[in-house]
Amino acid sequence: MPDTAPQLRLYNMLTRTKEAFAPIDAKNVRMYVCGPTVYDFAHIGNARPVIVFDVLFRLLRHVYGAQHVTYARNITDVDDKINARAARDYPDLPFNEAIRKVTESTNAQFQADVTALGNLQPTVQPRATEHMDEMRAMIDRLVQRGVAYVAQDHVLFSPSAMNARKGPRYGALARRSLDEMLAGARVDVASYKRDEMDFVLWKPSKKGEPGWPSPAGIETLGRPGWHIECSAMSMAKLLEPFGGGLKCDDPERNQFDIHGGGIDLVFPHHENEIAQSCCALGTERMANIWMHNGFLQVEGQKMSKSLGNFITIRDVLNDGLPQLGEWGDNTVRDRWAGLAARLSMLQTHYREPINWTAQRLAESADELHRWYGLLRDEGFGAPEKLSHASAVAAALCDDLNSWAAITALRQAFKVRDVAALGEGMALMGLLDPYFVTASDVPIFARADVDASAIAARIAERLNFINAKNWAEADRIRDELLQEGVQLKDSKDPATGERITTWDVVG
């Protein structure tokens, strides 16, 4: 830990307060974040927790040392949506093979997309299908302890039975009673449930569906419920390698430091995770600190396919910055668009709702262009240590105050403090050394062009277009092309308004 490191403080959803972070073991800081269900392209709402907790991962590594931090983010590869996609996309294949194709291709795309957003790989990415043994063992323990029961080849968890015992109470995270949660929840009504709030730990597989040997003496094949998957995977990757798990009676060894995810997961998913893990492992807490990022809207509206504003990460990388055009290496183009998307998201505090707009994305790309231009001009090299990132680190140590961190970067740019700018960008995952050192990056061919003059001529052309004076509009376009500046017209996908971008050609 750096001697001058500020005190890290994080908002804990469990206590509803900002707390000084005190790891269970400073030489083994552990964090779990709920990851993707791999059945379709990830959307920009999925990108937000990936970026938020990547920044926290980087900060923890900066404060405690990279070798002392373990970050687990799961991959859910058992789900009804996966089954439906497999049946739709590969009707002629055996079902298990179709499922494998869906999960492998979708996961590969997810990994490529989030890498383009500037994220580090987590330490481990457990897949649900690799941890069936742990799930069955946890379920057996819960049945033995009287908080789960078998009914019609299902195993269900009973929140009422949990609350009848000594120890943590169901609803502590959401801060609602069972009656309040029942009133506000969409719960499956099934005859085999003892109580409406009981939730599935294991269920029988339907004919043709993937299935595994069942726990609790059930003879038919089955598959896990969603919530038990995360309890089992976090135990397998953050507890068992370090002496915890079902064979350990030490409550401290059966807790980890931080659990993260989107605000939509507080109930029922995270509430159910806590119930399962605490009852199975005999702890008061599953994780000491629970962190949740806020919702995302698109151009002021809820993102949905019905509104036509559903945007995937791949959409942003391919089309979010149309001025990029086609590069010789579109992987590099994706990385630039990904950094712009990352900066755009980090301009809103992680706990606040975010409004995704095409304008902010474009503005973020322009700001990155200025920052990288300074780094290129001054010959900045990839830093081995972040000894000049103290202002950014101090901001992030205040509950990941990314806006204050970006303000520090802007100040460093203003005074041309290249070390503080570059190292601060690195700490936030905004520094890609390629864009500092490469000589053939198309966007930096703009450096010798008068951007303000071009913007004025584009505005003049737009006035002619609005007046339907096509001849004058075409004249400006052609004159700019003769000067080596090519215009490209497109529409804002959310508003339908004309967007004109430009690039240097020839």
UniProtKB/Swiss-Prot annotation:
EC numbers on record: 6.1.1.16
Binding-site residues for ATP, renumbered to this chain: K305
Keyword DNA repair: no
Enzymatic reactions: tRNA(Cys) + L-cysteine + ATP = L-cysteinyl-tRNA(Cys) + AMP + diphosphate
Classification via Pfam families: tRNA-synt_1e
Cofactors, names only: Zn(2+)
Enzyme class: ligase
Cofactor: how bound: Binds 1 zinc ion per subunit.
CDD domains: CysRS_core
Superkingdom, taxonomy of origin: Bacteria
Binding residues for Zn(2+): C34, C230, H269, E273
Motif ('HIGH' region): 36-46
Molecular functions (GO terms): ATP binding; cysteine-tRNA ligase activity; zinc ion binding
SUPFAM superfamilies, per database record: Anticodon-binding domain of a subclass of class I aminoacyl-tRNA synthetases, Nucleotidylyl transferase
Entry's Gene Ontology cellular component terms: cytosol
Single GO biological process annotation from the record: cysteinyl-tRNA aminoacylation
Record keywords: Aminoacyl-tRNA synthetase, ATP-binding, Cytoplasm, Ligase, Metal-binding, Nucleotide-binding, Protein biosynthesis, Zinc
Subcellular location: Cytoplasm
The UniProt record lists the keyword Chloroplast: no
Disulfide bonds: none
Residue span of motif 'KMSKS' region: 302-306
HAMAP family documented for this protein: Cys_tRNA_synth
Record-stated family: Belongs to the class-I aminoacyl-tRNA synthetase family.
UniProt subunit comment: Monomer.
Protein name as annotated: Cysteine--tRNA ligase
Source lineage: Bacteria, Pseudomonadati, Pseudomonadota, Alphaproteobacteria, Hyphomicrobiales
